[in-house]
Swiss-Prot record:
Part of the twin-arginine translocation (Tat) system that transports large folded proteins containing a characteristic twin-arginine motif in their signal peptide across membranes. Pfam families: TatC (PF00902). This is Sec-independent protein translocase protein TatC. One of its GO terms (cellular component) is TAT protein transport complex. Its main location: membrane. The keyword Membrane applies. InterPro entries: TatC. The chain crosses the membrane at residues 35-55, 93-113, 124-144, 176-196, 209-229, 231-251. Keywords: Cell membrane, Membrane, Protein transport, Translocation, Transmembrane, Transmembrane helix, Transport.
Length: 270
């Protein structure tokens, strides 16, 4: 009788010593402590932001100053509810406070998960966190400095001669904040490409072959974000986004998961 080969056994990597030696209660207590510190940092950031709420509102209103209708008083920002100013101040303080506290909150998250990682994972973890933070900040600055000054005046001046405009302050600021957050997330594209590559979901070959679809999607997104008919403004958004896609392809190749047979392949003789 032919004997069947023994079934393959999955060899699990042992847990890091720091993680294996700590009981569950200690992990929960550590999580509780990190959450409390994160909430404290957020509260401090909100208090600081609320103190400068007037300056923050003026900062968000800067893109309006590029519109002649606003500077000449033909378009005004108004509030339509009694508590709108108070609610708006708290809402703006939350987002600004979260922005101020985010580095400290991310550090608390990293300090909690780092003991459960292997040394090679810890080596790349902190640079990725810093890179993600820098990319998000770059996206926010890019949207605020280059895109909003074009988009906001165009939307305000569209059909300006046929309607009388009184823009709701809360809706305007909500739109600006949402737009800036979206641009910050869009600039995380290279980081996302690396994460998906390390998880084995995509690889650099797939990303390279899909560049046409990515370009079409980016052009459509740029047309939506910048509704002006000027191709230069559309290119202002599309070119950086596609450059980020190409950067993601390069990083996907650099941080690709190397197959075992490729690791064991001997180097060619010189």
């Amino acid at each position: 009788m032919t004997q069947l080969p023994p079934p393959e056994q999955t060899v699990l990597k042992p847990a890091p010593p720091e993680l294996a030696s700590a009981p569950l209660f200690d992990h929960l207590e550590e999580l509780r402590r990190r959450l409390i510190l994160s909430v404290v940092f957020l509260a401090v950031g909100m208090v600081i932001a609320f103190t400068y709420r007037v300056q923050l509102i003026e900062l968000v209103k800067v893109p309006l100053t590029y519109s002649e209708l606003y500077t000449t008083g033909k378009v005004q920002l108004v509030t339509t509810k009694l508590a709108s100013q108070l609610l708006l101040s708290f809402n703006l303080a939350f987002w600004a406070g979260l922005t101020l506290a985010l580095p400290f909150i991310v550090w608390q998250i990293w300090a909690f998960i780092a003991p459960g990682l292997y040394p090679q994972e810890r080596r790349w973890g902190l640079p990725f966190i810093l890179g993600a933070g820098f990319a998000f900040a770059a996206g926010v600055v890019f949207g605020y400095k280059l895109v909003l000054p074009t988009m906001v005046p165009f939307l305000i001046e569209f059909l300006a001669g046929t309607v009388t405009q009184m823009q709701d302050l809360q809706e305007y600021i909500g739109t600006v904040v949402t737009f800036l957050v979206a641009f910050g997330v869009a600039f995380e594209l290279p980081i996302l490409a690396v994460i998906l590559t390390r998880l084995g979901i995509v690889n650099h070959t797939m990303l390279r072959q899909g560049w046409r679809f990515a370009l079409i999607g980016i052009m459509i997104l740029a047309a939506v974000i910048t509704p002006t008919p000027d191709p230069a403004n559309m290119a202002l958004v599309a070119v950086p986004l596609y450059a980020l896609y190409e950067l993601g392809v390069v990083l996907s190749r650099v941080f690709r998961v190397i197959a075992p047979e490729e690791q064991e392949r001997p180097a060619p003789m010189s």
